[in-house]
């Protein structure tokens, strides 16, 4: 009887333990890599993991040829400054993985670095997986052909990503989203409010103007003006503002002192998820925060503005009808998106007010959020591990 992938013997014909090559390039990839390693060790306790790893992956037993920070470079200038070093690392990894010949190589996110590496290893007969699809479904869609040549399998968080790859006959497995696994289906709003010092009967609005300097600079003033308008209509309104680090907090405080010095807000160091769960509605920049807000069952409005030329370019490059993940998942506009010239305080406040006032429509919206949550809550770590074992013929 042939072993199933999850009960396979843990040694190769040559007697070598299952060997998995991994490259993670940033903190989010380190989290995914650690979860994958944990899930694989449940099935194959003596498996070996080696490559580029952060502290979480190393704590799970991954041997690091290079530290993850070597690849964690942001910004055009920084990338150009580090390019010779990055190219040298990629050349060395190509050589070392070719000599090691792991059963499977898994490139975790970092597509600009990993997809080329995956392609070189695949040419040498090594099976390759790219974990976390780049946003090829949204823009630069021709990248799908390079990904198809470089990988034996793409692991996708979202079902519409798999549907996109299927159109191009690129093997892709929908595994669900790790964030959906981590968040409860029914969040405890009162516990979140107690943690933040928000009264149980207060009306609470979360402002999340983004994590990048440019986003906070571009959005904070209009978000604050929106909160002032809403505070005039809802005197008991509490406003919470989670900020990712001290730099963004200082930046936001500077803008608030100029725009809305008399507006009382709860500034939070991190705690975005708690703030979303505690709030009746959120005003946020697009991105992963919108998905997290949906999983927190918090109604939201997405407001986003960028420099005019950047927006002009994005309009021509982006191929999707929506920018926020809740709408992309639903295939319809569940969440109001006010972009560029539409991102004005009066319009933002007008969209948020009915969300803050509650009612039957809000209950129906939260039910839709719950259904979408369930649709992507699939045990992503275990699904990813099974994909690796199947590709390794285990």
Swiss-Prot record:
Condensation of UDP-2,3-diacylglucosamine and 2,3-diacylglucosamine-1-phosphate to form lipid A disaccharide, a precursor of lipid A, a phosphorylated glycolipid that anchors the lipopolysaccharide to the outer membrane of the cell. It catalyses: 2-N,3-O-bis[(3R)-3-hydroxytetradecanoyl]-alpha-D-glucosaminyl 1-phosphate + UDP-2-N,3-O-bis[(3R)-3-hydroxytetradecanoyl]-alpha-D-glucosamine = lipid A disaccharide (E. coli) + UDP + H(+); a lipid X + a UDP-2-N,3-O-bis[(3R)-3-hydroxyacyl]-alpha-D-glucosamine = a lipid A disaccharide + UDP + H(+). This is Lipid-A-disaccharide synthase. Pathway: Glycolipid biosynthesis; lipid IV(A) biosynthesis; lipid IV(A) from (3R)-3-hydroxytetradecanoyl-[acyl-carrier-protein] and UDP-N-acetyl-alpha-D-glucosamine: step 5/6. One of its GO terms (biological process) is lipid A biosynthetic process. Belongs to the LpxB family. One of its GO terms (molecular function) is phospholipid binding. InterPro entries: Glyco_trans_19. Its EC number is 2.4.1.182. It comes from the Bacteria. Keywords: Glycosyltransferase, Lipid A biosynthesis, Lipid biosynthesis, Lipid metabolism, Transferase. One of its GO terms (cellular component) is membrane.
